[in-house]
């Protein structure tokens, strides 16, 4: 499969390791690359180290099509993550993007400065549905807040910035938030974070299964929502920014769907617990060849003309 240019760097293929537990430290990043990831998005880092929510923090209902997680943004803080990235770079020549979260523009600015000259780019996490008051989706549903945060990070960082969007808003708000991020200097949009929060109850204890009570929904059930968000963003902003799709991707067919919807690249999280990134990349390459595409970039947005036409019939699109 042909390499792709994403966020200012050459990726061997369009499939990256999403921000999550696997990319919380150097050994996990190395594991992801050895299993074929073309790029790494680190576990989200906050200004100070966090222990996160009490366990359980992840519950697997993949036999029902989804998983729930409520990590609570556990991380070692920026000083330690900088060391983890630098040690990783000593061994691997693979793009690394730092995922960061704070409770306002000043915090994002400080984090951006901390990773300047270290990470190849930033991903601003303004979309976690269970991070706690003042963080995550609470910020990411407010276009004005997203604009201020993005501008602060862009000014302080020496590379490209992507804003990770929440699916927990209506279509109009989604597009307003995306426009605010782009106007403030974002070069990419990552879509989407987990959906929710959701709840499961243990029948034996009559208590929530997750330690935090509620958590974000990931896995295959998230994919139709993520695809729709990617397609909506591509219709409105595909000429202006790169779009990175994430949510429910398990195999090559899923990747090609996201490419068709307008994503330039994708991230894999939940499925990486059981399947190698390289296997998904190989499947993607075979499917693209079967469909007559020489590479992934030729497939980007293939479904958008018909998607636009069908939205017109609903009165949702010009």
From Swiss-Prot:
Species classification: Archaea, Methanobacteriati, Methanobacteriota, Methanomada group, Methanopyri
Source organism of the structure: Methanopyrus kandleri (strain AV19 / DSM 6324 / JCM 9639 / NBRC 100938)
Protein name: Dihydroorotate dehydrogenase B (NAD(+)), catalytic subunit
Protein residues bound to FMN: 19, 43-44, 125, 164, 192, 219, 247-248, 269-270
Main location: cytoplasm
Subcellular location as annotated: Cytoplasm
Coiled coil location: none
Co-factor binding comment: Binds 1 FMN per subunit.
Tree of life domain: Archaea
